[in-house]
């Protein structure tokens, strides 16, 4: 399970500042869903290789009606979704009645809660936080989010130990044990070829999308066609069900974010679009099916969700549902809109289906397997270096400060998604346009479909950096004569 951390507190206590500080470690694309979650933002963050989802909530006023006000509904829902809460207060403003109301509500929820006193820059932290002990939430962690002061300590001494208790490292790195063998390449870490085979693992497939686009119908259609579901295996992600299934001799784990197998237990809150549930399913999947309603077209919510999928590095299959019943003219308009708004992800297969009637559903799994195989295929260093060399020959890197950027060699840096590491000189100065050129060149050369490909650049080390030049005996004698001449001239 990917842990969820919610930032709550009064308005203007620095929640958004801390949110930006936390998610910046992964340069995360914030999944902001307009309208549906007006005052909540979602982003991915990382601490020592352990990922978590961070929620930035709107301020809770704590008016005369208490904390349970309609203005705070979204923030209260974020508290329910979260595994841990960072309750933020303003050290400069001191203890306020709204802080007491929020603390009372948090105590009633019995959620792991840590009290964070922000804006302690320029203050004596010990004196600034004294009043907040009256909230009865235990130790107080002073920070200055705008400057980053105390944030690392907060992560290391609060979130990291809590995450260790929530999910031991061996559980978090469950898949890493498999992928570690994949990454050992020409560096003395040779492994037996048959020790690891990605084809032997079930493909984790998540079906995600906005409400009422047909996720449940598609899930039922897939399961109804196969009828080989052995049992429902409840997942660690809340309100999601992990359903083992088999198709064409290949094992899958269908991550159902619609709760289709427990429909009788679904509450009104679950029927709404649960952002957290969807984000956790994406994080846990190998391949994601993004379902879009053909009648409504691409919405901002679809693009936000798509951005999170790409930022997570997951393989992608786009499914345009409710294709039946549309006139040919409307179909052409929908395709033109898709080409225009989704032109930046030309690597993903697009399928036009009717989940209700089953047309086109059978072709989805061919693209799912293709995407998974592309993301897990092993490529040697010699092949990657050869592709890089051909790319440079076709289009040389630009000049930077009068010198040509030099690319030396490339090797694999990871899989799922495929990562290519390029070593060279001045590679940090490469413009984004050339980086995109290299990424597209590698994708076409490797025939990668359905999976994003990432390129990382590493600067070659200067062997003479931080080393003083050692003069030869002849140079030493010349230097002495020169120094004598300078002294006589004075």
From Swiss-Prot:
Protein name: GTPase Der
Family: Belongs to the TRAFAC class TrmE-Era-EngA-EngB-Septin-like GTPase superfamily. EngA (Der) GTPase family.
Pfam families, per the entry: KH_dom-like, MMR_HSR1
Coiled coil: none
Subunit structure as annotated in this protein's UniProt entry: Associates with the 50S ribosomal subunit.
Binding, GTP 2: 209-216, 256-260, 321-324
Keyword list, A-Z: GTP-binding, Nucleotide-binding, Repeat, Ribosome biogenesis
Keyword Nucleotide-binding: yes
Organism: Escherichia coli O45:K1 (strain S88 / ExPEC)
Biological processes, Gene Ontology terms: ribosome biogenesis
PANTHER family listed in its UniProt record: GTPASE DER
Function: GTPase that plays an essential role in the late steps of ribosome biogenesis.
Domain KH-like: 377-461
Source superkingdom: Bacteria
Binding site for GTP 1: 9-16, 56-60, 118-121
EngA-type G domain span: 3-166, 203-376
Signal is among the record's keywords: no
Cited NCBIfam families: GTPase_EngA (TIGR03594), small_GTP (TIGR00231)
Gene Ontology MF terms in the entry: GTP binding; ribosome binding
């Amino acid at each position: 399970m990917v842990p969820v951390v919610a930032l709550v507190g009064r308005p203007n206590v620095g929640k958004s500042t801390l949110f930006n500080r936390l998610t910046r470690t992964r340069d995360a694309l914030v999944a902001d869903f307009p309208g549906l979650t007006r005052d909540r933002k979602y982003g991915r963050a990382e601490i020592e290789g352990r990922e978590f989802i961070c929620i930035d909530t709107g301020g809770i006023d704590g008016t005369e009606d208490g904390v349970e006000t309609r203005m705070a509904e979204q923030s209260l829902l974020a508290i329910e979704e979260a595994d841990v809460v960072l309750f933020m207060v303003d050290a400069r403003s001191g203890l306020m009645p709204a802080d007491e109301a929020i603390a009372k509500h948090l105590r009633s929820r019995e959620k792991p809660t840590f009290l964070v006193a922000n804006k302690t820059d320029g203050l004596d932290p010990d004196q600034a936080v004294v009043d907040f002990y009256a909230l009865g939430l235990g130790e107080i962690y002073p920070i200055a989010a705008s400057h980053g002061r105390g944030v690392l300590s907060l992560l290391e001494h609060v979130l990291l130990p809590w995450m260790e208790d929530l999910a031991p490292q061996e559980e978090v790195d469950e898949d890493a044990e498999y992928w570690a063998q994949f990454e050992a390449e020409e560096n003395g870490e040779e492994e037996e070829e048959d020790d690891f085979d990605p084809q032997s693992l079930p493909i984790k497939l998540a079906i995600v999308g906005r409400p009422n686009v047909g996720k449940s119908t598609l899930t039922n259609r897939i399961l109804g066609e196969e009828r080989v579901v052995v049992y429902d295996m409840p997942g660690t992600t809340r309100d999601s069900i992990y359903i083992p299934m088999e198709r064409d001799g290949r094992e899958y784990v269908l991550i159902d974010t619609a709760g289709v197998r427990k429909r009788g237990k679904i509450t009104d809150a679950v029927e709404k679009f649960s952002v957290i549930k969807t984000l956790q399913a994406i994080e846990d999947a190998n391949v994601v099916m993004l379902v879009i309603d053909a009648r409504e077209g691409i919405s901002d919510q679809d693009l936000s969700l798509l951005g999170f999928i790409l930022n997570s590095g997951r393989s992608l299959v786009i499914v345009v549902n409710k294709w039946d019943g549309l006139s040919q003219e409307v179909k052409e308009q929908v395709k033109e809109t898709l080409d225009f708004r989704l032109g930046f992800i030309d690597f993903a297969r697009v399928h036009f289906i009717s989940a209700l009637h089953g047309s086109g559903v059978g072709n989805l799994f061919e693209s799912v397997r293709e995407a998974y195989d592309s993301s897990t295929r092993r490529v040697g260093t010699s092949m990657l270096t050869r592709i890089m060399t051909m790319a440079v020959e076709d289009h040389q890197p630009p000049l930077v400060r009068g010198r040509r950027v030099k690319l030396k060699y490339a090797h694999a840096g990871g899989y799922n998604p495929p990562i290519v590491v390029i070593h060279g000189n001045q590679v940090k100065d490469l413009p984004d346009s050339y980086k995109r050129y290299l990424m597209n060149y590698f994708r076409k050369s490797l025939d990668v479909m359905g999976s994003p490909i990432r390129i990382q650049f590493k600067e070659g080390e200067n062997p003479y950096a931080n080393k003083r030049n050692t003069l030869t005996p002849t140079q030493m004698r010349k230097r002495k004569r020169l120094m004598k001449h300078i002294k006589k001239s004075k």
